[in-house]
Amino acid sequence: MILPELFDLWQETLEWQPDGAQQARFQQLYDLILEGNQRFNLTRITQPEEFWEKHLWDSLSGLAWLQKSQPDLLTKSLSVIDLGTGAGFPGVPIAIAYPHWSVTLLDSTQKKINFLEEVIDKLELNNTKTRLGRAEIVGKNLKHNCAYDIVCLRAVGNVDICVNYALPFLKKTGIAILYRGQWSAQDSLSLEENLGKAGGKILEIASFTTPLSESVRHCLYISKK
């Protein structure tokens, strides 16, 4: 199956669009996901337009606020880690879109790490590596503690737990991006209380509508105090 290109939609919504080589890698990633799904369950999202929106576009939407608020930051050589990456989202699309960044894909499941090693090899993502382990343990490792400019977490678990996983990986000036669905004012109050105890603070809570299905998504941007 062929992925839609939707270059204009990329530009309109995220003020970015893939070049030809990046689009080819997105297609190759899609092909590998479809093939991998025959061996083990990677994702239920396999139709071309849904894959484009819920995996590719959604992965890069987390950087939209940074693009607007700190555009110079994205031009630097940043270190990024994707916690609980699963099939490689958002980490692999980020690595494709920002080849000057160093991206680490962390997951606790060996078969997913094996699959991601295959993806990295076939897409020739020289800026990307994997790490097998659990976030709450790896974050205490001296090599990874306070080591990253950007920490991404697209897991659907409890947000307070996600924050506690993310903060140890952050440099003092780093930013954690938590991808969420629905979000409320009460959620913000609860998060602020937990962050106060954990030594973090909310920089921004961005709300946006997905371009095809028009569903509401949120990204939380968090830093250390």
Curated annotation (Swiss-Prot):
Report the EC code(s) recorded for this entry.
2.1.1.-
Q: Which UniProt keywords apply?
A: Cytoplasm, Methyltransferase, rRNA processing, S-adenosyl-L-methionine, Transferase
List the Pfam families hit by this protein, alphabetically. Answer: GidB (PF02527)
Gene Ontology CC terms, in alphabetical order: cytosol
Task: Tell me the residue numbers annotated for binding S-adenosyl-L-methionine.
Answer: G84, F89, D107, S108, T109, A135, E136, R154
* Residues spanning the signal sequence: none
Q: Which family does it belong to?
A: Belongs to the methyltransferase superfamily. RNA methyltransferase RsmG family.
What function is annotated for this protein? Answer: Specifically methylates the N7 position of a guanine in 16S rRNA.
Q: What is this protein called?
A: Ribosomal RNA small subunit methyltransferase G
Q: Which species expresses this protein natively? A: Microcystis aeruginosa (strain NIES-843 / IAM M-2473)
